[in-house]
């Protein structure tokens, strides 16, 4: 039996304008702004929450972490303000209103769930190694394969039922802070001992720890409830 060291909590996206981001990502994911915290998009399931974190810097490089979503039609996302970047694959790559990449997978409308997230995809130097590292932390199996772009590894069940956590090979190194990251609940010392790097401790501005995984992907750690 695999031991679960951490539990998935939610996702966070850096944005320059909350209202613009919420108007796109709310309908795109089947979420709505929390009446008391409009920067948090919710649907009643805590793990589905997407926090929109305002940052001063705009997007400058391709997102190394992006979301894949289920759609009835790509035009639904275009109507929300997205633009098509590449439609040559069985999925369509788009940019959201702030330029952040996402991929849309068209489904039969009768099969669509209210919550539209399909996958969280992470560009990786070594997909097999980093996926295995996260699989050990989440206590779930890891699977390895290839797609049209090369090596790919993925976890099922780490971020909730029917959501895949995917690591895909890319040649370029990470050069900037990821604008999309995930939050987990767990023990910071255990994670550091396993190879994570501590970036920031709780201080006057934050009550959580910020860490980076062995490939430098930022994530936040909260105490277990």
Model regions: which residues?
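Glyoxalase I/VOC metalloenzyme domain signal
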Residues: 1-37, 42-86, 95-149, 153-205, ...
């Amino acid at each position: 039996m695999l031991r679960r060291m951490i539990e998935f909590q939610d996702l966070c996206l850096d944005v320059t304008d909350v209202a613009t981001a919420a108007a796109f990502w709310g309908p795109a994911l089947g979420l709505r702004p929390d009446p008391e915290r409009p920067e948090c998009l919710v649907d009643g399931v805590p793990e589905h929450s997407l926090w929109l974190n305002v940052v001063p810097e705009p997007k400058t490089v391709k997102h190394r972490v992006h979301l894949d979503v289920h759609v009835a039609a790509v035009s639904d996302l275009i109507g929300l303000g997205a633009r098509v970047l590449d439609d040559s694959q069985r999925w369509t790559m788009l940019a959201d209103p702030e330029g952040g990449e996402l991929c849309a997978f068209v489904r039969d409308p009768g099969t669509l769930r209210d919550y539209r997230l399909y996958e969280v995809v992470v560009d990786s130097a070594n997909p097999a190694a980093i996926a295995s590292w996260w699989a050990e932390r989440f206590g779930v199996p890891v699977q390895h394969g290839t797609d049209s772009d090369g090596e790919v590894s993925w976890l099922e069940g780490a971020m909730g039922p029917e959501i895949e956590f995917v690591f895909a090979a890319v040649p370029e190194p990470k050069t900037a802070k990821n604008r999309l990251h995930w939050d987990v609940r767990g023990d910071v010392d255990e994670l550091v001992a396993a190879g994570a790097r501590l970036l920031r401790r709780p201080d006057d501005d934050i009550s959580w720890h910020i860490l980076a995984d062995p490939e430098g992907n930022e994530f936040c750690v909260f105490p277990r409830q």
